[in-house]
């Protein structure tokens, strides 16, 4: 998910959270990699985004006490999935990325044996790191900053996966350029996750 300098910040923050942490990140098009273009927008978004990630409520979705929560996250699907996500978080730390939000070690009352993880966010991520290249399939997002839209498109096109990507901008030229040049099965403009037509194949072909 690419964020340009003219993006509407509140819309970006809301959709970063819902697209990254909905279904505990267990979606083939979850926004796991965020690229901001320009230092100004990066510095504006980062603190708000980190706080929004921390504010995600992790709980038993069947608990009536959390029925009115706007952003509620349940468990990952299995103990194996939880361990894989935790191992990937540890890998990111060892690779030198900064773990700005750490979702490990979370315990949900009444579900002590559940496979729950909180939200995790990495900053200072570099192309080539495993946390950038591997599909983690869990509640983990990475955010990185580049200078130009061309740089962001290059990151997309060099990535091993290409199921879906999005651009946040109010600029029609940037939107058209992104639509033409980004190599991805589905491309969205000002949406968190491009909506697939479910009865047609969407295998992430570049």
Question: Predicted regions span which residues?
Answer:
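Cytochrome P450 core scaffold surrounding the K-helix E-X-X-R motif
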Residues: 128-133
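Short beta-strand->loop structural element characteristic of the AMP-binding/adenylate-forming
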Residues: 1, 141-142
């Amino acid at each position: 998910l690419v964020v340009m300098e003219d993006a509407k910040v509140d819309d970006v923050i809301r959709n970063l959270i819902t697209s990254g942490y909905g279904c505990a990140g267990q979606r083939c098009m979850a926004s796991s990699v965020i690229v901001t273009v320009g230092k100004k927008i990066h510095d504006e978004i980062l603190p708000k985004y980190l706080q929004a990630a921390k504010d995600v409520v992790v709980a038993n979705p069947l608990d009536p006490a959390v029925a009115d929560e706007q952003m509620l996250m349940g468990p990952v699907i299995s103990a194996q999935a939880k361990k894989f996500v935790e191992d990937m978080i540890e890998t990111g730390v060892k690779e030198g990325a900064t773990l700005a939000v750490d979702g490990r070690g979370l315990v949900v009352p009444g579900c002590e044996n559940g496979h729950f993880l909180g939200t995790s966010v990495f900053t200072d991520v570099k192309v080539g790191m495993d946390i950038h290249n591997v599909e983690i399939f869990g509640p983990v997002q990475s955010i990185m900053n580049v200078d130009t839209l061309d740089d962001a498109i290059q990151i997309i096109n060099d990535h091993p996966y290409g199921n879906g990507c999005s651009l946040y901008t109010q600029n029609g030229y940037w939107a058209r350029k992104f639509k033409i040049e980004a190599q991805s099965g589905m491309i969205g403009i000002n949406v968190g996750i491009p909506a697939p037509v479910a009865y047609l194949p969407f295998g992430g072909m570049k």
